Amino acid sequence: MLNPYLLRNQIDAISKKLLKKKFKLDISLISSLEKKRKKLQIKTDNLQYKHNTLSALFKKEKKIQELDENLKRTLTKSSKNLSELKIELNLLQEKIHNFSLSIPNIPSDDVPEGNSSENNKIVKYWGKKREYSFAVRDHVEIGNKLNQLDWKSSAKISGARFIVMKGNIALLHRALSQFMLDLHTIKHGYTETYVPYLVNHDSLYGTGQLPKFTDDLFHINSIDKKKYVLIPTAEVPLTNLFSNQILNETELPIMLTAHTPCFRSEASSYGRDSKGLIRLHQFDKVELVQIIQPELSMNALELLTHHAEKVLQLLELPYRKVLLCGGEMGFSATKTYDLEVWFPSQKKYREISSCSNMSDFQARRMKTRYKKKKEKSNSFVHTLNGSGLAIGRTLAAILENYQDSDGRVTIPKILQKKYMQGIEYIN
C-alpha cells in the first residue's frame, strides 16, 4: 500500500510514476473521495468537540442534581448524530482503503521504461554456453527416455500441469532443495523456517496477492468455516510472520529461507508453457526473504540477488541477470531483477528467479514497523524476497545443459558426493 500522504499531497507526481507500470491512476476519483473525507472529518471533529462539552456540562449538573431536560435531549440528539457521522466516515475510509489496495507500488527511478521483455535491461551474462555435436533434446524428451518423468500418471491422478518424478530424477529434485538450503543457511546467513502451506486472506492482502490476483490462487473454502488459500510462494507466510508487529532496530536485518511447494492456477498464463516443468500448478521453490531498514534495502536487493546467482554459479549453469522494465514488474515491487537460465533446446534464456525490493509497500499493508534507537516514532520496514531457486526449473535446466549424446545426464559436480549418494550420471 502506498503512503497515504503521497496520494493526498503528490497525486499528480505519483500518477505519472505509476504510468511506468502501465497503471492509470484515477485522479478524479481519489481526489473526490479525499475531498469528501476531509469535509466529513472536520464535521465529525467539530461535532465531537461540541458533544464532549455537552457531556462535561451534563456530568457537572448531574453531580449537583440540577439536570436540565433540554440539555439531556440535546446530548441524546448529539450522541445520535455523532454516531451516524462516524459510521459514514468509517464507510468512506473503508472505500478509500479498498481503492488504495488496487494501486501498485511505485517503480524506482532507475527502472527502465517499457511494457515488454524487450525493454528489460540486461545487466550481465555469466557462464559459457555448451556447444553440442548432436541434436539437443528438451527436458521432457530426456525425462521420458529415462522413464523418470511420468506425465501420464500425473494426468491420471490430478490433471494437466502436474508431474510425477521417479528414481534418480526424484533424488536430484530433493538434492537440489537440500543444496540450496545448505548454501543459504550456512554460507549466506539465512534462518531456515518451516511454514504452513495454507494461509488466510489477511496474509495474502498483506503481501499484495489479494485482491488483484485472486484468480491465480487455489482457494480452500471449508475448513472450520474459514477461508484458506494454498500458498503461491513462501514469500506469503515468511513475510507475514511479522505482520502487526513493532520490531527493534537491533533485530534487523531479518533473513529467512524456506523450501515449500507452491500452488498457482496459472489462469493469467493460459496456453503458455503447457509442456514440461516450466509452468506447473504445483512446484517446489526455495524462497529468500529479508526485512530491513529503508536506507539499506537497495543494497540488500543486490545482496539477495547475488545469493540466488550463487546457486546457478555453483551448479555451473549459464544465466543472465536482467533489470525488469516497469511494465514487466510485479504489483508490489519497486525494483526487480530476474535471473534467466539458458535452455539449449529453446535457444533462449528463461526466468528461474525473480528478486524484488518491495520498499515499505507490504509493510504498510501488514502494519510492520520498527523502533529506531534514538527516535520516539516508529518507521515502516522494507521487505525483499526472491527465489533461491525454483527447483523444478533448475532441474529442467540441468537435464538440458548436462545431457550427453547417449541420453544420459551428468550430475553437477557439487551435488554428486554430498547430495546424490555418489551418483555421477542419470541413465
From Swiss-Prot:
* GO biological process, any: seryl-tRNA aminoacylation
Q: Which GO terms label this protein's molecular function in UniProt? A: ATP binding; serine-tRNA ligase activity
**Any idea of its EC number?**
6.1.1.11
The reactions it catalyses are: tRNA(Ser) + L-serine + ATP = L-seryl-tRNA(Ser) + AMP + diphosphate + H(+); tRNA(Sec) + L-serine + ATP = L-seryl-tRNA(Sec) + AMP + diphosphate + H(+)
Q: What is known of its domains?
A: Consists of two distinct domains, a catalytic core and a N-terminal extension that is involved in tRNA binding.
Quaternary structure annotation from Swiss-Prot or TrEMBL: Homodimer. The tRNA molecule binds across the dimer.
Record's protein name: Serine--tRNA ligase
The organism encoding this protein is Buchnera aphidicola subsp. Schizaphis graminum (strain Sg)
